[in-house]
Amino acid sequence: MGYLSTDKKKITTKTFAEMKQAGEKVTMLTAYDFTTAGIIDSAGIDSILIGDSASNVVAGNANTLPISVDEMIYHARSVTRAVNHALVVCDMPFGSYQISREEALRNACRMMKETGVDALKLEGGIEIIDTVKSLIDAGIPVHGHLGLTPQSVNKFGGYGIRAKEEAEAEKLISDAIALDKAGCFAIVLEKVPAKLAAEVTRQVKAVTIGIGAGAGCDGQVLVYADALGMTQGFKPKFLRHFAHVGEEMTKGVQSYVDAVKTGGYPSAEESY
């Protein structure tokens, strides 16, 4: 039958389920702006995540906590204007769904209406199940996120590997099953042992998307700036640089500066 994602039709949550059933890996990268999203989409990615990691990557914050609903909407609008093929998922930021189900639903509906994204992603397990169900009942596709959940960095005391101990591993499996039964179409598994992630993948119908969770997940996600070698001083074990865009950008800027300083740009052909 060939790969399901190569015909350039719009990827949907239904496509995700079909890909899992067919054994086709799902690819996901983050994007936060129109230009980058257009490049990533045209390259054939299955899904684009407007991550609250924009707080770090775009705004330079130390963690994801400061970013607001308004800021996420701004980034999401920029991305959806560029995307024709990929399934677009947007993170609900910290504080937008933890206070009450009613406030979560209000924020979720606003984000869906004002951005045009295909789904929303929430961090957490059984403790947010009622909220997840409320969103799904309202017709909003929900993408779960377990393991290292960056919005809980202060509770965890850092960004270390999660679920290494039996009790936490068992809870993660229970959380994944609960999210699956609630109707989540996909679940990110972040920085958990590969064997555990593979076991979760076997036990749930939802597509599992790994980041630092081994090859046994149904798909993988990375922050695009990390994957393309644009960030400095960040090289966790799970990260591979698939390009060296940062180096090329530096060379390009240096070439531009040199051309302007020496009078080589603009040339007569580049002038009106």
Question: Where are each of the predicted segments found?
Answer:
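Alpha/beta enzyme core
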Residues: 2-272
